[in-house]
Amino acid sequence: MSLDISQFPVLAQANTPNELRQLPQALLPQLADELREFLLKSVGMSSGHFASGLGTVELTVALHYVYNTPFDRLIWDVGHQAYPHKILTGRRDRMHTIRQKNGLHPFPWREESEYDTFSVGHSGTSISAALAMAVAAEKEQAGRKVVAVIGDGAMTGGMVFEAMNHAGDLHNDMLMVLNDNEMSISENVGALNNHLAQLMSGRLYTTIRESSKKVLKGMPVIKEMAKRTEEHLKGMVVPGTLFEELGFNYIGPIDGHDVDALVETLRNMRSLKGPQVLHIMTKKGRGYEPAEKDPIGWHAVPKFDPSQFKKPATKPGLPTFSQVFGKWLCDIAEQDEKVLGITPAMREGSGMVEFSQRFPKQYFDAAIAEQHAVTLGAGFACEGFKPVVAIYSTFLQRGYDQLIHDVALQRLPVLFAIDRGGIVGADGPTHQGAFDLSFMRCIPNMVIMAPSDENECRQMLYTGYCYDAGPSAVRYPRGSATGATQVEAMTALPIGKGVIKRLGKGIAMLNFGTTLAAALTAAESLDATVVDMRFVKPLDVDLVKEMAQTHDVLVTVEENAIMGGAGSGVLELLQKLKMPKPVLQIGLPDEFIKHGSPEEVTHDLQLDAEGMLAQINAFLAD
């Protein structure tokens, strides 16, 4: 159910950027207030990313007011902060469907709107995309402008600096807006800096600056003195030296919540030549006190009533797999001070908060730099430490070369705790953990484990900790564990050995991971054998051979892409053993998995017990 737009009289007049640009500038502050209120209420109805969007309301209004979108290109980095953008670009009445099945995509998405010029989900991509669009605009002589909006958190990723280095060299016209919400706005980032930014972006300053360069072109000594003087004067009031060194003209910082100042500064910058940086200071969660005080806790929210100023109380329930990992990490760190925990900016999501607090000298946050996080683990392993890299499946993709070249090639004992393996749900195709078993299985020297419940997860983590002949990975899903009885003792599992969970006849289901419960349910109707394979690599050769010899049909089950996954490993083994056998592979199809609740996606892909049974019966009927 959408909100009553009559409660937002100015926002009602700005359903698209064209309508927004018809408004008098004097109404923009009221528009920003209404947009923020609309965002509060709509996310409360739908759930979703919350605090980031509250901090970009004024910026979003100003960008669409000054730039001729979608002709002018606007690229959002990651997209957590793009909810206001969606509201102002014709999707206002569908905001209550965001992140839901058949609803709006959680991030900017090209297929969804012409205003979403680049599909995003992983951080650090906006500058590269914007540079390409700026080069294309110049080649086509289109006269269009290009703007990328990137947060200070994404600036920790190396790809951003690679792109900036290239942009500074090519010198195409483009604007990079640095949305800095690391700290609250201080007195120095008020009227004085807003005035300074407008002066520095104005025609007079730019003309004098460029004319001086031409005059001094033939006098290198004087030119260098002038350059240093300019840097010294600017350095006293703006922290832009790094950007200037990379070839960008730096302007700011300015108050990112002063919509009039943003409009005037952006108007001035719109005509500037070459790559530009506008540094704005914002407050994540702006306008909603609980989110301002705890922007991390309010980064994303379930459905809630904003008027209550608190999120709904969570009912006591099963621990998540992330929490199971976090507890194990603390337990093992108590025993071994050489255990080091590494995360690429996912402390909360990966369950490492307690570990970071109790063992601060053993905790390393590599920031949004997955390549660095993986090789950091490799370096620690070289020196005799026990590195544990906690990383989401979708983000491990970004450190793939390092996994191969820096870890596996050297047989270094780095343990990868891979969270969010399989179906993630509402965040959609950019965040589903669909490919990790496939891209790890082909790497020599890797040991890959897939626990069926929280106890196996704990024992497998300990197995990886004890394994010193090379890298190992334990891959587990998002969300609550299965409810298995907790076993505190830690025992290393025999490498490459599975266990039979149910003896049947005719059909043997070889299960990899937490789909075991559904497989056991489906097996009851079929009187099938069910095997908890535990290890994706190395496979239990003897057990697979036994199942092939004693059953008519094999069924592999995994929450990973069928192509190249665990089931493919079983087929390869059967071929090697020269044992032809009908094999049905149940897993994720050859497509990007859309957003929806995990339960909806699992059902649609026939990965629940009902779906498995239907797939097996269809296979037998052919």
Swiss-Prot record:
It catalyses: D-glyceraldehyde 3-phosphate + pyruvate + H(+) = 1-deoxy-D-xylulose 5-phosphate + CO2. The gene is dxs. This is 1-deoxy-D-xylulose-5-phosphate synthase. Homodimer. SMART domains: Transket_pyr (SM00861). The keyword Transferase applies. The keyword Ubl conjugation does not apply. Keywords: Isoprene biosynthesis, Magnesium, Metal-binding, Thiamine biosynthesis, Thiamine pyrophosphate, Transferase. Belongs to the transketolase family. DXPS subfamily. It comes from Shewanella sp. (strain ANA-3). Catalyzes the acyloin condensation reaction between C atoms 2 and 3 of pyruvate and glyceraldehyde 3-phosphate to yield 1-deoxy-D-xylulose-5-phosphate (DXP). GO terms for molecular function: 1-deoxy-D-xylulose-5-phosphate synthase activity; magnesium ion binding; thiamine pyrophosphate binding. PANTHER family: 1-D-DEOXYXYLULOSE 5-PHOSPHATE SYNTHASE-RELATED (PTHR43322), 1-DEOXY-D-XYLULOSE-5-PHOSPHATE SYNTHASE, CHLOROPLASTIC (PTHR43322:SF5). GO terms for biological process: 1-deoxy-D-xylulose 5-phosphate biosynthetic process; isopentenyl diphosphate biosynthetic process, methylerythritol 4-phosphate pathway; terpenoid biosynthetic process; thiamine biosynthetic process.
